[in-house]
Design a protein with these regions (language model features):
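N-terminal presequence-like segments and the immediate start of the first folded domain
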Residues: 2-95, 99-112, 118-166
Length: 166
């Protein structure tokens, strides 16, 4: 037995009004855009013999974008520069970024984003001073992450970059 309410019976409330929409007229299919030509990634090799044994490349160029792998304080011979000296290590990492970008026909002013990793937050100012000096007023978007350690013993800083080749 249905109970009464102000709106009528509950059984009656379960019945809903149906709204019937008329079907929209058929449209012509939109013209398809031709597919963009595939852009192949290009490996960037700065010519360092020591990095041949690594499972990655120092940079990739895709169209006008250049992705620079994390650079550390290793010189062209693969030797650690500036053990215990964050400024010297930052200088070498930035020099390596510059070298990778140059191999792709770009420069430091083309950098649009940088990510840095340091092992000691107290060394941030020293690292930042050197980076700012080298970038000479150029200010890319940036992130800094403090980490417990980097890939090899003695490393204090690692920096990666994304650049837009003009």
């Amino acid at each position: 037995m249905a109970t009464k309410s102000k709106r009528g019976t509950r059984a009656g409330a379960a019945k809903a009004h149906r709204i019937v929409k008329k079907a929209a007229p058929a449209r012509k299919p939109a013209a398809r855009r031709p597919a963009a030509p595939a852009v192949k990634p290009i490996d960037i090799d700065p010519g360092w013999a020591w990095d041949d044994r690594l499972p990655f490349v120092q940079g990739k160029q895709i169209g006008n974008l250049i992705y620079v792998s994390g650079q550390v304080a290793l010189d062209p011979d693969g030797k650690l520069v500036g053990e215990g000296d964050i400024k010297a290590q930052t200088r070498q990492a930035m020099e390596n970024i510059k070298t990778v970008l140059a191999a792709a026909g770009a420069g430091l002013r083309d950098i649009i984003k940088m990510t840095g990793f340091i092992t000691d937050a107290d060394k941030y100012r020293e690292m930042s001073e050197v980076r700012s000096e080298i970038l000479d007023g150029h200010r890319p978007a940036s992130t800094l992450v403090v980490v417990k350690a980097l890939a090899f013993p003695g490393l204090m800083v690692e920096m990666e970059a994304i650049a837009l080749k003009r």
